[in-house]
Amino acid sequence: MKTFSTRRLGKSTLELTPIGLGAWAIGGEWRFGWGHQDDTESIATIKRAVALGLNWIDTAAIYGLGHSEEVVGRALQDIPRSERPYVFTKCSLVWD
């Protein structure tokens, strides 16, 4: 049930949907987080977004101190590789 068209990203060859899924809140509870998030619901949300045609997810190691990236990874492992969205992540902090 793909419902989104794509657009080329700048001069690259990447074709992206106009909107993606922001995964900050999926990081859950921690000092700078969004409060408790249910991982099962987060995984279902990611899978639904991909089923609807979104083809990129924004996450970062700082979102839940890596928890967001872990949940995104768990959600994507059940999606065939050819149907997986792009995952854009970033880093900036070092923590022990």
Question: Which stretches of residues belong to each language-model region?
Answer:
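A short, structured active-site edge motif that brings together acidic residues
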Residues: 83-96
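N-terminal binding-site loop/beta-alpha segment at the start of enzyme catalytic domains
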Residues: 1-86
